[in-house]
Regions:
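Histidine-/acidic-rich catalytic cores in large beta-rich domains
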Residues: 61, 66, 149-153
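Conserved active-site beta-strand element of glycosyltransferases/polysaccharide synthases
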Residues: 77
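Catalytic core of non-heme Fe(II) oxygenases with the double-stranded beta-helix
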Residues: 80-139, 145-152, 157-173
């Protein structure tokens, strides 16, 4: 796969219904003011780990890699006006070699752009793309006074990725929060 791929019915109906039941109130999740979103991962929402495990073989088939492994999965609920939700143009840096971005629910679609092409996702649809290699972003959030959009970001990488060889804390070196030497001392 080279170009992004739109996938219908990423989850079985049973898994999708169970996911909706498990989410409950996303406003109880951690709030990320920078993107105006509420976040949770597998530690706070265990169903995410279950779904990621189930989708690993699907991701292997889509990305033509029988060795990729799940790195982390993140649930994000976007809403509000102060500030409006946003996602700037970027390439991922945190163990997101392969990405499946799934729409969970929405009042109004909020297109995902990958390499200058927009993709409209509907509930239980996903977009497969290379998060670390392809620029992706979202344009202006539609109808911020009423819209709510929830996404799950399923991320995968190869076993030789730093996430597996050095551990998830190595992101501090990637993001320039500490030097390699400082990280080594801290993790001895």
């Amino acid at each position: 796969m080279k170009n992004p791929l739109l996938i219908d019915n990423l989850l079985s109906q049973k898994d999708y219904d169970n996911l909706l039941k498990e989410i409950k109130n996303p406003k109880d999740f951690d709030y990320d003011a920078g993107f105006s979103r509420y976040l949770n991962d597998h530690r706070g929402l265990p169903v995410l780990k279950e779904l990621s495990d189930k989708l690993t073989q699907t991701a292997r088939n889509i990305f033509n890699s029988q060795t990729l492994l799940s790195t982390y999965t993140l649930f994000a609920h976007y809403e509000g006006q102060d500030p409006e939700p946003s996602l700037f143009k970027h390439k991922d840096t945190n163990a997101c070699t392969y990405t499946l971005d799934m729409c969970v629910y929405q009042n109004e679609p909020w297109d995902l752009w990958v390499e200058d092409k927009n993709y409209t996702l509907y509930p239980n649809q996903a977009l497969a793309y290379y998060g670390e290699d392809q620029f992706h972003w979202r344009e202006k959030f539609p109808s911020p006074e009423t819209n709510k959009v929830a996404m799950i970001f399923f991320h995968f990488a190869e076993p030789d990725h730093w996430y597996f060889t050095k551990g998830s804390s190595y992101i501090d070196v990637i993001w320039g929060k500490m030097t390699e030497e400082e990280w080594k001392l801290k993790n001895e």
